[in-house]
């Protein structure tokens, strides 16, 4: 596949104001995207939503200027979770949706992510076409006068998205729930949905100021939520990240409930035959699924790979420990608030609690060793390394697993070993890491 110049695995992301997220470049991106969308649909409209970062307004204005300069009509949705933009893209029949967000990153960062007409990921071919159009922007014939696009503010976006979420909410009457909204995109939507479902809700981090998104809060900083739940006698707590495409729970005792727990609970309640997760998913989940006659499909790390495998196999349920969980029969993209609601629906259907789930799914000990090498690509095919891995697998005897994977950004090999005996897995990881280090130092 042709290598991308600007788009990463999750759109374009950088420090706001630095290339490529400068107003001039984002305007060029908007013009390029507008040109591509107009080729497909001469009456194209694009919806734009954003999280609560202070740079969102600047980038939104630049993007809208570029899109309208090519004759595309822009519909502003305002502050809305990323999956809400996906929902409105398909609900309004837009040619595309755009989210201005950097998810769980600090406020200085921002990003631009596109959805296709159905609210799913923009195709690789379309992304490459947009990249080519950016580089050709100077040669495009100008659009003028009545042919320019319009800009409107859609004031019903939050209400419609909230109604969609509420349609999937169980009856939460009598439940005391604490929410951490990360000062992000879900700060209004999440408390409203859980209150409408009947829960007694205590919501924190619901006062965004443009700079406090994810700061010491949200799904990557859950210590405060755990304390609130323990000391406040809540049934459970739920934390979202800045753009609310993921969710993590804590049980009534403050224990972390992550994606592996949610996948087990949902697979049982929804009658799934198989679940898709990643190579980092704990083996305890695999064992529990096997006991229930279910299979676990593993992919590379990243929710996009989980998504691709679900589509390829015609499956519905998959996710990662981070709280990115996909229910493709309900939504084409990860949705933190929806994930929380569907998880609670599964819990109520099975008549269980998050406390019981935590106690049942006891994670296998896992150790990770990073080894610096000269050529990370050559390590996988090195005979000595392959022999060391084979020896490790024999020692684990089906009661554990070993995985070697290269870092995406550094010349590192990550050696992960998982098993029932913590001392044994540390010894195995050290032995394999030593071989990797020796072979890696030699350039393999």
Swiss-Prot record:
Gene3D superfamilies per UniProt: Alpha-D-Glucose-1,6-Bisphosphate, subunit A, domain 3, Alpha-D-phosphohexomutase, C-terminal domain
Q: List the taxonomic lineage.
A: Bacteria, Thermotogati, Deinococcota, Deinococci, Deinococcales
Is Metal-binding among the key words of this record? yes
Protein name, per record = Phosphoglucosamine mutase
Q: Does the keyword Transferase apply?
A: no
Entry's family note: Belongs to the phosphohexose mutase family.
The record's comment on cofactor binding reads:
Binds 1 Mg(2+) ion per subunit.
Q: Which GO terms describe its biological process?
A: carbohydrate metabolic process; peptidoglycan biosynthetic process; UDP-N-acetylglucosamine biosynthetic process
What's this chain's function? Catalyzes the conversion of glucosamine-6-phosphate to glucosamine-1-phosphate.
Q: Which NCBIfam families match?
A: glmM, PRK10887.1
Q: Enumerate the HAMAP family for this protein.
A: GlmM_B
Listed GO molecular functions? magnesium ion binding; phosphoglucosamine mutase activity; phosphomannomutase activity
Q: Which cofactor does it need?
A: Mg(2+)
Swiss-Prot/TrEMBL keywords: Isomerase, Magnesium, Metal-binding, Phosphoprotein
Origin organism is Deinococcus radiodurans (strain ATCC 13939 / DSM 20539 / JCM 16871 / CCUG 27074 / LMG 4051 / NBRC 15346 / NCIMB 9279 / VKM B-1422 / R1)
**What residues form the catalytic site here?**
103
Q: Name one GO cellular component term.
A: cytosol
């Amino acid at each position: 596949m042709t290598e991308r110049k600007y788009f990463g695995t999750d759109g374009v992301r950088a420090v706001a104001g630095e290339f490529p997220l400068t107003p001039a470049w984002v305007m060029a991106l908007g013009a390029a995207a507008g040109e591509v969308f107009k080729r497909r649909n001469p009456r194209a409209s694009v919806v734009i939503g954003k999280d609560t970062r202070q740079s969102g307004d600047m980038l939104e204005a630049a993007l809208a200027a570029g899109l309208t300069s090519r004759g595309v009509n822009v519909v502003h949705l305002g502050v809305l979770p990323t999956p809400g933009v996906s929902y409105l893209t398909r609900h309004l029949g837009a040619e595309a949706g755009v989210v201005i967000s950097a998810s769980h990153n600090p406020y200085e960062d921002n990003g631009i992510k596109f959805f296709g007409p159905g609210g799913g990921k923009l195709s690789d071919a379309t992304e490459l076409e947009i990249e080519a159009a950016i580089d050709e922007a100077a040669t495009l014939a100008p659009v003028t006068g009545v042919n320019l696009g319009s800009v409107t503010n859609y004031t019903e976006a939050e209400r419609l998205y909230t109604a969609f979420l509420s349609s999937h909410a169980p009856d939460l009457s009598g439940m005391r729930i604490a929410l951490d909204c990360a000062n992000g995109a879900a700060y209004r939507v999440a408390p409203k949905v859980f209150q409408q479902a009947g829960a007694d809700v205590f919501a924190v981090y619901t006062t965004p100021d443009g700079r406090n998104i994810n700061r010491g809060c949200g799904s990557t900083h859950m210590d405060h939520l755990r304390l609130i739940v323990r000391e406040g006698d809540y049934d459970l707590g739920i934390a979202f990240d800045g753009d609310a495409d993921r969710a993590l729970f804590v049980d009534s005792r403050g224990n972390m409930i992550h994606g592996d727990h949610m996948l087990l609970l949902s697979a049982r309640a929804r009658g799934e035959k198989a679940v898709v997760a990643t190579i980092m998913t704990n083996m305890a989940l695999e064992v529990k699924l096997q006991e229930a006659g279910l299979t676990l499909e593993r992919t590379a790390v990243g929710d996009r790979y989980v998504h691709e495998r679900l589509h390829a196999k015609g499956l519905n349920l998959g996710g990662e420990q981070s709280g990115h969980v996909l229910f493709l029969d309900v939504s084409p993209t990860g949705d933190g608030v929806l994930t929380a609601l569907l998880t609670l629906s599964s819990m109520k259907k099975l008549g269980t609690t998050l406390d019981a789930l935590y106690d049942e799914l006891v994670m296998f000990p896992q150790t990770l060793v990073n080894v610096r090498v000269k050529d990370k690509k050559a390590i996988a095919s090195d005979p000595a390394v392959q022999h060391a891995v084979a020896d490790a697998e024999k020692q684990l005897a089906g009661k554990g697993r070993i995985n070697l994977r290269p870092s995406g950004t550094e010349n590192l090999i990550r050696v992960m070993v998982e098993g029932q005996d913590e001392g044994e897995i540390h010894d195995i990881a050290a032995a394999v890491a030593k071989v990797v280090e020796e072979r890696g130092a030699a350039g393999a």
